């Protein structure tokens, strides 16, 4: 049944995550969880939602017309969400608020993409030079 398959899928996913975390820790690698929500649906270039290729589901088309691998775009977005969090975490509240005002999308991490990280990085550097 569908419910059993879903439970099995979640169990396998958790098992794989746990195995990867254990091996990473054993090798001295730091592990951090990031929300993967919408990472495949949103284009890493910031152009919005992607359209999946009906013949090859691993390919998608951005609004700009560029064709890209969905998993690669999602990987960029997942990495961006991690680095956005790490860039903002050590900052005092006033600086963080200032950056969030300049790049408002970083407030809501589930919609952050690689292009937002690039904008945030520019603004962080502008703050440092000011």
Q: For the regions a protein language model found, what residue spans apply to each?
A:
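Positively charged, helix-rich recognition surfaces that bind polyanionic ligands
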Residues: 1-130
């Amino acid at each position: 049944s569908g419910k059993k398959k879903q439970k099995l899928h979640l169990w396998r996913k958790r098992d794989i995550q746990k195995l990867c975390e254990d091996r990473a820790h054993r090798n001295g690698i730091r592990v951090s969880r990031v929300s993967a929500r919408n990472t495949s649906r949103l284009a890493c270039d910031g152009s919005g939602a992607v359209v999946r290729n009906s013949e090859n589901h691993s390919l998608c088309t951005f609004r700009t017309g560029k064709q890209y691998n969905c998993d690669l775009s999602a990987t960029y977005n997942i990495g961006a969400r991690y680095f956005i969090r790490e860039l903002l975490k050590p900052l005092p509240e006033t600086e963080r608020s200032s950056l969030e005002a300049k790049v408002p999308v970083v407030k809501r991490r589930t919609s952050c993409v690689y292009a937002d990280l690039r904008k945030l990085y520019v603004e962080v550097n502008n703050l440092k030079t000011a």
